[in-house]
A protein has these predicted regions:
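Short, hydrophobic/aromatic-rich segments at coil-to-beta transitions
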Residues: 48-53, 108-114
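Short, solvent-exposed mixed-charge patches
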Residues: 140-142
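N-terminal leader/targeting segments
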Residues: 18-71, 82
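N-terminal signal peptide c-region/cleavage motif recognized by signal peptidases
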Residues: 14-16
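Sec-dependent signal peptide recognition
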Residues: 2-8
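Long, charged/polar, surface-exposed segments that mediate recognition or autoinhibition
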Residues: 20, 61-113
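Short, exposed beta-strand-loop hairpins at the edges of beta-sheets
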Residues: 114-136
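Residue-level detector of intrinsically disordered terminal segments
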Residues: 10-12
Length: 142
């Protein structure tokens, strides 16, 4: 449980009118710059999971990027973060925390949060490994 709260504390990002950061990585930057920042922070590409893997505040995470479904070439559409968790009620724990931190978005849809003034949206999902955090930037084309 302590691991969960340390991770969530790390994910309480800075709200800014110009950019949204995940672990200090500006998601509104170009894909090339985001990739360089990911490498600089020690995340490495893992072929078996088809994702970057590394430690975020002492917790192993897996990150993948969607740069294909975008409104502007060279920008990031989505950052997908998988957080392995064994707790049966992991999704419930995480959403209760985010309900306190962030405003719900998308007409009050459950598990969808507005996390920045720039239009970045976070959707919290359950996955086979734990939880999945999907950050959709303003450049994401649905």
């Amino acid at each position: 449980m302590k691991k969960l709260f340390v991770l969530l504390a790390a994910m309480v990002m800075t709200l800014s009118a110009s950019a949204f950061d995940f672990d200090g990585i500006n998601l509104n930057a170009s894909v090339n710059k985001i990739s360089a920042e990911i490498a600089k922070r020690g995340y490495v590409y893992d072929e078996t999971t088809d994702a970057f893997t590394g430690m975020c505040q002492g917790t192993q995470i897996y990150m993948s990027m969607n740069w294909k479904d975008v409104k502007e070439a060279g920008k990031l559409g989505q950052l997908i973060v998988d957080v392995p968790m064994k707790e049966q009620n992991a999704l419930s724990i995480v959403t209760k925390m985010f309900n306190v931190i962030y405003h719900t978005a998308d007409g009050g849809k459950a598990n969808v949060y507005s996390v920045s003034n720039d239009g970045t949206i976070l959707e919290v999902q359950s996955s086979s490994k734990g939880i999945r955090l999907v950050y959709s930037t303003p450049f994401y084309k649905k």
